[in-house]
Amino acid sequence: MSGGLLIAGTTSDAGKSVVTAGICRWLVRQGVKVAPFKAQNMSLNSFVTREGAEIGRAQAMQAQAARVEPTALMNPVLLKPGSDRSSQVVLMGRPVGEMSARGYHGGRQEALLGTVLDCLAELRGTYDAVICEGAGSPAEINLRRTDIVNMGIARNARLPVLVVGDIDRGGVFASFFGTVALLSREDQELVAGFLVNKFRGDVSLLEPGLDMLRNLTGRPSYGVLPFQHGLGIDEEDGLRVSLRGSVRESAVSSPVGEDILRVAVCAIPLMSNFTDVDALAAEPGVVVRFVDRPEELADADLVVIPGTRGTVKALEWLRERGLAEALRRRAAAGRPVLGICGGFQVLGEHIEDDVESRRGHVEGLGLLPVRVRFAREKTLTRPVGEALGEHVEGYEIHHGVADVTGGDPFLDGCRVGAVWGTHWHGSLESDGFRRAFLREVAAAAGRRFVPAAGTSFAGLREEQLDRLGDLIEEHADTDALWRLIESGAPSGLPFIPPGAPA
């Protein structure tokens, strides 16, 4: 067989990524050889494949759910925003330039349709089933002409479409109906039904509404997934991380030692790969929060400056907010600070940037003996090394080239006192290294904190992916879902007026 399915959504963050991952995990547990696919992703959270290609981190997570190695075929187009109006375009894993939204939708996007269809065809020729994820909503009528990720690809590849709606936000029935009613007759023929996500309460109270929706649209609901905490793994962007103060705390479990460890993550502009701190949040006794005010660093045992798509912009933001001076005071007092990728670069002496911000010479915070020069060629690699006596694996995604002139070696970067810096994303996912690093932080902070010996980040990730598979298996109509994947959308689905505007 060469089955396929497109998971569309009524909105962004409706749950498309986790539903796609859940279906992949459910299928692979049934012995189906399955792969994920997203034609075009807009995200600052990315991943480096074994062949050195950059793809959306959500697709890497979905590949893990499918128990296959992620490749550039699974996300041929990645857009990495640099501002509200422009993005870096990554094609088949390599950056090909910056482009404005108007320029992209004005012609470039449409020209990429052949590329993404070729990638999808290659995957469908290799796997039993390909589960595709859409983007935003398929009913963005102003963008339909150049769409290559929702109905544009569904029409060309004849994929059945399942629309996911987040009922926790309210208005899910109007969203379901409106999504279908704004599609053309040809697009509507592929929309097979709906999947309710994040439901709280008694499903029997929802069922009359689902029956009414079926009567109105001629399309069934394929399941009601209950709301579950802790399943927003590898989010595509910072949608859930407001930049207004301490707004996102990890759910801390009981510490092994006497004290908890508090981690403050600076919520810098254009945060990228902030999933780096997920491994810290997974440790019992470690609480992680995102902050944007200097006073919020006062009780933090560790401050993390994460990656960013705008290093110079992040420096300006840190200075404007008074965080730069707070970081200098921390460093002088021997209190731990960790910079990762762009966060590492801001800790250096100066930056020469004629590529990203085109600001030329910019002074850094001066906390590490590092000089950074931005190169047009992006570094995309998966390094392996050792630090603090432990094996470490990571991945690098950056234009900045660091010249380290002093300090103690730390991965590819350095350490001076209690200030660490590295380009390596994902290093904290190495369990032994993470525990050794947290012991160093606890000692410097004077905390009686003991890392849990048995915490496996990879194991916890597998448990989360299994929970996603369980959600599909237990709360979706899997027989109907399998028929949809295998045979496509049923014929004779009714047209819901008014349809797409002329």
From Swiss-Prot:
Keywords: Cobalamin biosynthesis, Glutamine amidotransferase. It holds the Pfam family GATase_3. The keyword Disulfide bond does not apply. Pathway: Cofactor biosynthesis; adenosylcobalamin biosynthesis. One of its GO terms (molecular function) is catalytic activity. Residues 260-433 form the GATase cobBQ-type domain. InterPro entries: Class_I_gatase-like, CobQ/CobB/MinD/ParA_Nub-bd_dom, CobQ_GATase1, CobQ_N, CobQ_synth, GATase_3, P-loop_NTPase. One of its GO terms (biological process) is cobalamin biosynthetic process. The active site is at residues 341, 425. Belongs to the CobB/CobQ family. CobQ subfamily. Catalyzes amidations at positions B, D, E, and G on adenosylcobyrinic A,C-diamide. NH(2) groups are provided by glutamine, and one molecule of ATP is hydrogenolyzed for each amidation. This is Cobyric acid synthase.
